[in-house]
Amino acid sequence: MDSKNGINNSQKARRTPKDRHLKIGGRDRRIRIPPSVAPQLFRLTKELGFKTDGETVSWLLQNAEPAIFAATGHGVTTTSNEDIQPNRNFPSYTFNGDNISNNVFPCTVVNTGHRQMVFPVSTMTDHAPSTNYSTISDNYNSTFNGNATASDTTSAATTTATTTV
């Protein structure tokens, strides 16, 4: 008999082990990582001063958000907030061997209604379209409504192709 809990050994043996971890999206919330990656994750957690490995993974995802968006077309952070968030500063760390440098980069958080995406502020302006889309529309309308010559058609098509990329 376990005097601390008031349960005898036979009751302990009959109890079925339950997975105490929740499932998220039908998947177990625990993740498997290769043995070669685990020490790196543990070391990074310690060096960044986080209490859990989950905080480190969250930090990694936040800092990789622009690259994830570029690869998938959407971000990874979900939110219930329907408003566009104001500009924020997110910490960014550069890890190079044994040295970590801490920088703060301004970021813009954009909410698309069901997902929140984080972009560095520089990417919001550096990659903005340099062409007025009404000009492209006007070129298209004049070209394909029969109001343009053959040379105008070639010029408008070339302009459209180069400015919409």
UniProtKB/Swiss-Prot annotation:
Residues 1-21, 146-165 are annotated as: Disordered. Residues 12-21 have a biased composition (Basic residues). Its main location: nucleus. Keywords: Developmental protein, DNA-binding, Nucleus, Transcription, Transcription regulation. Residues 1-11 have a biased composition (Polar residues). One of its GO terms (molecular function) is DNA-binding transcription factor activity. GO terms for cellular component: nucleus. Mostly in anther in young buds. It holds the Pfam family TCP. Residues 148-165 have a biased composition (Low complexity). It is found in: Nucleus. Residues 17-71 form the TCP domain. Required during early processes in pollen development. This is Transcription factor TCP16. It comes from Arabidopsis thaliana.
